[in-house]
Amino acid sequence: MTKYIVQGGHPLFGEVEISGAKNAAVAIIPAALLVDGVCRIENIPQISDVTLSLKILEHLGAGIRVINRHTVEIDASRIRSTRTSYELARKMRASYYLIGSLLGRFGQAEVAMPGGCNFGVRPIDQHVKGFTALGAKVMVEGGFINASTETGRLKGANIYLDVVSVGATMNIMMAAVRAEGNTVIENAAKEPHIVDLANFLNSMGANIRGAGTDTIKIQGVDRLRGGSYAIIPDQIEAGTYMAAVAATGGQILVKNIIPKHMDCITAKLVEMGVEVEEREDTLLVRRSGPLQKANVKTMPYPGFPTDMQPQITTVLCLAEGTSLVTESVWNNRYRYVDEFRRMGAHIQVDGKVAVIEGVPALTGAPVHACDLRAGAALVIAALAAKGESEISCVQYIERGYEDIVTKLQGLGASIRTVEVPGESEELEAHIG
């Protein structure tokens, strides 16, 4: 098992390059199955979820050619199966995007029940509602989600999502892109990676309008051609480094970003006393004075992202006064709080609300990551804390952060990896 050893208490200085967006990549890679030709995908992040996604496609019969560290070519012209590997697909939540892509192209899909981060029930009822409206029959049998059509092709429909769901919006979009006729998705999610998926599909010949609004209109096409596409920068990775310098103090230049995507995060950090200077594709982030209390509520985009909730909570642990964090997107996303308490944080949780009494400093401690974003938050806490911290279960962090140790070292952080023999790193299906 790999662990991180962090000597905290050092401010961060320097530049950090942001990788391609994880949440876009894990949808765009399955979407390549909808294309009859070869897709060249650039700016792919080097993270374990991407590696797993490519392995799943390869198991289905897709040709995978690695051009360089951040570019792959996917040839889905010779797919030999619509049934995913149980052992591979169960390890990640995003494997459910294979239902939409396989169903959209072949009219059938058998996908193992997905895993992912264990911070609440991850229902796929809105996905199923959309697939059913498009003419599919969906059942769960033997640990697999089986979806099929009688005619082999879906038919366009009007679909209203009962709740704003990023996953359902993207999955239905993929299923509908090659359906017969027109599809309208109402109450759609608006996240940047939804727009990125739509742009990818449109670049391959799809006809999708309205991505980024609450109504998406899709005119089905018979086929998609091959082409090249570059994934957008990762909003959450950028926000994580911004939160890190907010917690430790210092000044960093966050490079390769889309500033508009960062507005919801930037606004809250500025409220807390962090200075942020926006440039064309960079943000200069500086924190020299004391942190101020703030109230944060997670919301669908363009609101404050749930994937940044643990990281902003870390910063608020060091702010003067009492702060409130309300988690309105997922249940049980405060599982990391006990680990923070080991480091001296004062946090009380009542349902969806965390009450945070700021402390002058955190202290190093042995802690373990319980999911991807909580793990990143623990890294931030360890960087800001006095003394040494040991973070275990870091494989969850590496699901979504490319070269996090190297990037932090480049900012002056004292962080290193150590290998502990005899301990398993296997990700359980329900944990991320």
In which residue ranges do the predicted regions lie?
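Short, structured segments at the rim of ligand-binding sites
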Residues: 1-432
